[in-house]
């Protein structure tokens, strides 16, 4: 069996028809990881015992001839900011180097209940803060499409394992583009659901009003199936929504004829790579040929999105990361002689430079005398951004944009320029700020063979619409 072409359905059918066992499939993936991941560095921890125990359960179901669960035997990887009971969970940080999660995140529980086999935990920017996966305490992840380039961040490891074929699907988190941007850079599908669509219980918090969990997959259908499994109300997360979960995979293949699709003019201006622009515009033309009506829309406050995001996100991070103090969890400084010294030295030794930078910025934004000037003003602009999208969605069913301004950049290219790194998220942060769903789907390649992604936005809880449009883009590209 060629594990490189496995999908969710193909995996389940192969096990059901006894073409392969779940155990054999899992072992094949571990062999591939051992052979190939050393150079990519996408996995931080492998959960072999847990995975093989789960695979054995699936094989027992198949042996009895019973119906297999939806994700039976599916090899999945989990971003290392999501708790997995009994498995090391580091958030890419030295401060959690030896932390063993005491419980499973809700999304992990749901995946295993549906039959998925969790291979291990993926590398990420420390506490999900970054756009290149160069901020991990455990070394950078390399892009499987070009190992001299970044995979994107912060969920770079989760995108890379799908692109490299060392997992069939994976989970990541998205706070400012951390699913969609790496999906674009690695040439896979990355889906960020509406805020509240998927439980955040068990996610190590970066910015609680912006954090989302979502899937990576090779194609839109598998991303849709993954969302069906992990979505839904969770009593353990007060922000999760009591909204029925549709069968998103039913949208695959449905026509876009008659749909109104918006093109946001602010996303096609200065700074957009010409090859990215050409690929995205070609996909928009394909949607028009398929019968969609293309309408230009305006999102005028987009230019304020980056400063707004970095004020809101860092303010929330400074509060959330206060819990890592040397008293609980993992790292405690051995040099400290007093309690205050323990706090200071443990955090200084445990946090990396980018995390420290964001904690300082967020603490400053929340401090007396600056709260109104910065944080409160950012929240007001956030409201204006939401109004922009409300006005646009009054005219259209979905909005398409480039996912990123450029294809994947070189390792080290932006590492010493935080502002240049932050600007890499300019097309993705708006969806997080207003809580709408977004998906990145491959739409072409640069002359150097680097993947290019197209992004689709939809109204709150209208992931089905977004998936239909994304699949139409995918289908048109496959037909070329």
Swiss-Prot record:
Molecular function per GO: ATP binding; glutaminyl-tRNA synthase (glutamine-hydrolyzing) activity
Any Pfam family hit: Amidase
TM regions (residue ranges): none
EC number(s) given by UniProt: 6.3.5.7
SUPFAM superfamilies linked: Amidase signature (AS) enzymes
Record carries keyword ATP-binding: yes
Domain of life: Bacteria
Residues at the active site: 79 (charge relay system), 154 (charge relay system), 178 (acyl-ester intermediate)
Catalytic reactions on record: L-glutamyl-tRNA(Gln) + L-glutamine + ATP + H2O = L-glutaminyl-tRNA(Gln) + L-glutamate + ADP + phosphate + H(+)
Region described as Disordered: 133-156
Keyword Nucleotide-binding attached: yes
GO biological process: translation
Keywords assigned by UniProt, alphabetized: ATP-binding, Ligase, Nucleotide-binding, Protein biosynthesis
Any one of the GO CC terms: glutamyl-tRNA(Gln) amidotransferase complex
PROSITE patterns: AMIDASES
NCBIfam families found in the cross-reference section: gatA (TIGR00132)
Function noted in UniProt: Allows the formation of correctly charged Gln-tRNA(Gln) through the transamidation of misacylated Glu-tRNA(Gln) in organisms which lack glutaminyl-tRNA synthetase. The reaction takes place in the presence of glutamine and ATP through an activated gamma-phospho-Glu-tRNA(Gln).
Assembly with partners or alone: Heterotrimer of A, B and C subunits.
Family designation: Belongs to the amidase family. GatA subfamily.
Protein's name according to its UniProt entry: Glutamyl-tRNA(Gln) amidotransferase subunit A
């Amino acid at each position: 069996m060629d594990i490189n072409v496995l999908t969710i359905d193909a995996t389940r059918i192969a096990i059901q028809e006894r073409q392969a066992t779940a155990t054999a499939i899992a072992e094949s993936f571990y062999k591939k990881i051992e052979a190939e991941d050393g150079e990519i560095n996408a996995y931080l921890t492998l959960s072999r015992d847990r995975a093989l125990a789960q695979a054995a359960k699936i094989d027992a179901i198949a042996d009895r001839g019973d119906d297999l669960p939806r994700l039976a035997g599916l090899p999945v990887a989990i971003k290392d900011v999501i708790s997995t009971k009994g498995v090391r969970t580091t958030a890419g940080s030295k401060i959690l180097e030896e932390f063993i999660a005491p419980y499973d995140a809700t999304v992990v529980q749901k995946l295993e209940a549906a039959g998925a086999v969790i291979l291990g935990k993926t590398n990420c920017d420390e506490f999900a803060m970054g756009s290149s996966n160069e901020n991990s305490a455990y070394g950078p992840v390399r892009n499987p499409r070009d190992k001299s380039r970044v995979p994107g961040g912060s969920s770079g490891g989760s995108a890379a394992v799908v692109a490299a074929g060392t997992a069939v699907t994976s989970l990541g988190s998205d706070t400012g583009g951390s699913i969609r941007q790496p999906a674009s850079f690695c040439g896979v599908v990355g889906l960020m659901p509406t805020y509240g669509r998927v439980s955040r219980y068990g996610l190590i918090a970066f910015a609680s009003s912006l954090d989302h969990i979502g899937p990576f997959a090779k194609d839109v259908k598998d991303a849709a199936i993954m969302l069906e499994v992990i979505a839904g109300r969770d009593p353990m997360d007060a922000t999760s929504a009591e909204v029925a979960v549709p069968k998103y995979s039913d949208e695959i293949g449905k026509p876009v004829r008659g749909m109104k699709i918006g093109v946001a003019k602010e996303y096609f201006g200065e700074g957009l790579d010409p090859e990215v622009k050409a690929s995205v515009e070609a996909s928009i033309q394909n949607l028009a040929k398929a019968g969609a009506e293309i309408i230009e829309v305006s999102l005028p406050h987009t230019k304020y999105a980056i400063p707004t995001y970095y004020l809101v996100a860092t303010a929330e991070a400074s509060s959330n990361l206060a819990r890592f103090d040397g008293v609980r969890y993992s790292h405690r400084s051995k040099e400290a002689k007093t309690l205050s010294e323990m706090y200071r030295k443990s955090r200084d030794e445990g946090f990396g430079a980018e995390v420290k930078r964001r904690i300082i910025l967020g603490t400053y934004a929340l401090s007396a005398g600056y709260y109104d000037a910065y944080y409160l003003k950012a929240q007001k602009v956030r409201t204006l951004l939401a109004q922009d999208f409300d006005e646009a969605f009054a005219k259209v069913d979905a909005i398409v944009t480039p996912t990123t301004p450029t294809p994947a950049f070189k390792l080290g290219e932006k590492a010493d320029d935080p502002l240049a790194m932050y600007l890499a998220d300019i097309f993705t942060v708006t969806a997080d700020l207003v809580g709408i769903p977004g998906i990145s789907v491959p739409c072409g390649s640069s002359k150097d063979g680097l993947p290019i992604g197209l992004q689709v936005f939809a109204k709150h809880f209208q992931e089905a619409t977004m998936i239909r449009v994304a699949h139409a883009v995918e289908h048109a590209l496959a037909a070329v």
